[in-house]
Amino acid sequence: SVDGAGVVLPRDGRPAHFRLHFSLPAPDPALTQWQLRFHRVEVDELRSSAPGWQPEPQSFFRPGSEDGLLPMSFQQGLPVEWSGAQTIDVVASSELLRTLRPQVVRLAQGHEQDKRNLAIAVTLYASVLVLAVVAMSLLLGARELSFLSFLAFMAASLLQMLLANGHAYALPALAWRGALGAQGLNLSMLLVCASGISVARDYA
């Protein structure tokens, strides 16, 4: 189904099939390549294809080496010789109710979008890490167990953020969680809730 701004994927894992229609100008060597982009959401598999063009499938939970260490989007470079009306078939599946929003933009524009989003994510990671270091320092200095619950809450929150952004699956130490799929996200959220309750209990 379409929500007005993208394609809504069924939450039971059934593949959604849809077709993208767009038009490209004549190739210009002075400009960067066109690319097909989707914002990064929890899809089990994302496939794009057109006559003579079939890139490797992509997955939120199993990022490839081409995605880099901190991927912020799904992207595929379009053939440089394409111009005029084009059609791409897309197949996507997810165990969660998610919306895919496709974009066809220049490579340079896509990189700028990713840089902005990555800067926000890294800032949030750094903030949580600073709070975790403060909690650990207080725990070691004051020997108060209440700081242990706060440290656990910060650690669980950082893990949840890494999983929600898909960055955990690109880290060798956490890549195994990709096998859990959407359930791994749910389990991580339960950890955040449990540690948050402990903090509320200790500081009440």
Give each language-model segment a name:
Residues 103-141, 145:
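Cytosolic-side membrane-insertion boundary helix
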Residues 1-118:
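Soluble non-transmembrane domains of integral membrane proteins
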Residues 83-85, 97, 122-126, 151, ...:
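Generic hydrophobic/packing signal
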Residues 129-204:
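Juxtamembrane segments at transmembrane-helix boundaries
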